[in-house]
Amino acid sequence: MPIKTQNDLPVKEILERENIFVMDENRASHQNIRQLEIAIVNLMPLKEDTELQILRSLSNTPIQVNVTFVTTSTHEATHTSLSHLNKFYETFDDIKDRYFDGMIITGAPVELMEYEEVDYWDEICSIMEWSKTHAFSTLHLCWGAQAGLYYHYGIPKRVLPKKKFGVYAHRVKNRKIPLVRGFDDVFYAPHSRHTEVLKEDILKHPELTILAESDDAGVFLLMDQDGKKIFVMGHPEYDRYTLHNEYERDKKKGLDIDMPVNYYPDNDDTQKPLLQWRSHGNILYSNWLNYYVYQEVPYEFINNREIIGK
């Protein structure tokens, strides 16, 4: 899939080195095809790392995607330069009159705070409410998934006694749903979180369907009845070294952190981590774009976007 980015987005060069087709604005302007408009609300502190991971994950179908990165205006980022944000990001005020085929809300390192204590919580609530009418399908990741379940359904999160950290095996629960088409019976995905949403709380809402879960990591993937809201409890977009970098960071801080589960060969953190989740992560993003965005967005929704010239 061609990913359309700004000409000088820093991660563009890395994607091109990986043979991922990245189309800059100049070339895209000469393409007479329908492209998907995807908004990515990037709440992660290392924004450029997350940009790379998600763009890589979106690059595996023939559909052309134009990405708009969105940041919060009520929280000042401390790990990403202001010049980068000003150049490559929009705020909610900038995009609120636009219509998007799909939206992604990322995780954020604020799990141990109550939702209402997060300084940008009101803004995220506004975005999630707006998404009901202005984004045809929204993919929520990790904390973004927990926040979405809390906002839309009132489902609480629970603090874990120990951080859920590593790569866990999951089982597909409902093969009839296109979102898991092509998945193996058992697949792996990374988790890095201090909180969880209990299955018993989800089951109180019959409008939600659990699609995959783990004996060790709990519910991984669920969605509403029409695929407008999809929730992923882990990080299928993570690259090989993301958990390693988090592990080394926390060790340097002197935190009580266990080695990531099922990650290093022979549990030896001097060895190259095993990449066991890339194919299923790619399938998940491809299925979302194809079955819940590209094939489902009605003409009337697209026309709303074209009427206002966005």
Swiss-Prot record:
> What's its EC?
2.3.1.31
Any Pfam family hit: HTS
- Residues with site note (Important for acyl-CoA specificity): 111
Q: List ligand-binding residues for substrate.
A: 163, 192, 249
Tell me where it resides.
Cytoplasm
Could you cite one Gene Ontology molecular function of this protein? homoserine O-succinyltransferase activity
**Pathway(s) annotated for this protein in UniProt:** Amino-acid biosynthesis; L-methionine biosynthesis via de novo pathway; O-acetyl-L-homoserine from L-homoserine: step 1/1
Q: Where is this site: Important for substrate specificity?
A: 192
* Sections of the chain in a coiled coil: none
Instruction: Write down the chemical reaction(s) this protein catalyses.
Output: L-homoserine + acetyl-CoA = O-acetyl-L-homoserine + CoA
Is ATP-binding set as a keyword in this record? no
Q: Per its database record, what is this protein's job?
A: Transfers an acetyl group from acetyl-CoA to L-homoserine, forming acetyl-L-homoserine.
Q: Which PANTHER family match?
A: HOMOSERINE O-SUCCINYLTRANSFERASE
Q: Please report the name of this protein according to its UniProt entry.
A: Homoserine O-acetyltransferase
Species per Swiss-Prot/TrEMBL record: Agathobacter rectalis (strain ATCC 33656 / DSM 3377 / JCM 17463 / KCTC 5835 / VPI 0990)
> What's the gene?
metAA
